[in-house]
C-alpha cells in the first residue's frame, strides 16, 4: 500500500506569478533604503497572490476566516487562486466568500464589534480608512497606507482579533487565512467603485436591503453628503 502524500503546508511555487513579480519590479515603484528599513517591499508574492506594499497608496483589501475555504473543497478554491486574469480571480473569490462557507464567526455581533473596533483604533494615526465592511466570513477594506506597511497593519489586525475571538468563542487554533488580497487604487473613479463595492457587499450577499442597514460597515456612518466623520472635520 502506498503511503499517503504529505499535506502541503505552503502553496507550491507559481513560476508564472514569480515572473510577473519580477517584471513589475523592473518598471514599477521601488522602495528606497529608508522604506526598506520600514519593511515596505514594493511588489512581492506570498504563495498564490501578488502584493504591492508602498507608502502613500490606497488599497482595496480582502482577508477571510481560516475555514472560509474548506479543505473538502480545496480543489475548487485552488483553481480560483491559480486563475491568471487578476480581475476574473477577484470576482470568483468574492463570489465564493459571499456564499458563506465555514462557521462564519464574524456573524456573531460581539465578534463583529470587536473586529470593527480593532480596525478603527488607529484610524487617522497609522492609516486612514476610506471604507470597510465586516461580512460573516471575510472583511473588505479601502485603506490609505501611510507610514506603516500594509502587511504589518493586516498582521496587527488579524493578531489582535484572533486572540480576542478565540477567547470569546472558546476555541483554539487559526482564526484567519494566512494571506490576503490587495488591489492598488488607481484613480478617483476606481476609489469610488471600491468604496461602493465594499459598502454594498451585504446587499449583494442578500444580508441587508440597504447598505446602511448592515451594522458593521462604514456605510452606516456616512451623512447625507456621503461623508464619514473624519471627512466632516476636514
Question: Where are the model-predicted features located?
Answer:
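Short catalytic/metal-binding and nucleic-acid-binding patches
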Residues: 1-234
Amino acid at each position: 500500500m502506498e503511503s499517503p502524500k504529505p499535506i502541503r503546508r505552503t502553496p507550491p511555487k507559481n513560476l508564472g506569478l514569480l515572473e510577473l513579480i519580477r517584471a513589475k519590479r523592473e518598471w514599477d515603484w521601488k522602495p528606497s533604503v529608508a522604506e526598506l528599513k520600514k519593511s515596505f517591499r514594493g511588489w512581492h508574492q506570498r504563495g498564490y497572490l501578488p502584493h504591492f506594499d508602498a507608502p502613500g497608496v490606497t488599497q482595496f483589501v480582502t482577508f477571510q476566516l481560516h475555514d472560509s475555504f474548506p479543505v473538502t473543497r480545496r480543489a475548487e478554491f485552488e483553481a480560483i487562486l491559480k486563475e491568471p486574469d487578476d480581475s476574473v480571480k477577484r470576482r470568483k473569490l468574492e463570489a465564493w466568500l459571499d456564499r458563506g462557507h465555514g462557521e462564519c464567526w464574524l456573524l456573531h455581533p460581539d465578534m463583529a464589534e470587536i473586529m470593527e473596533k480593532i480596525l478603527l483604533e488607529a484610524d487617522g494615526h497609522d492609516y486612514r480608512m476610506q471604507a470597510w465592511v465586516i461580512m460573516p466570513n471575510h472583511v473588505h477594506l479601502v485603506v490609505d497606507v501611510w507610514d506603516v506597511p500594509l502587511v504589518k497593519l493586516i498582521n496587527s489586525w488579524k493578531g489582535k482579533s484572533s486572540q480576542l475571538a478565540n477567547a470569546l468563542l472558546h476555541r483554539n487554533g487559526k482564526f484567519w487565512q494566512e494571506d490576503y488580497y490587495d488591489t492598488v487604487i488607481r484613480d478617483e473613479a476606481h476609489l469610488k467603485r471600491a468604496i461602493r463595492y465594499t459598502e454594498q457587499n451585504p446587499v449583494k450577499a442578500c444580508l441587508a436591503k440597504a447598505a446602511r442597514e448592515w451594522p458593521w460597515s462604514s456605510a452606516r456612518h456616512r451623512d447625507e453628503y456621503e461623508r464619514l466623520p473624519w471627512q466632516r472635520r476636514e
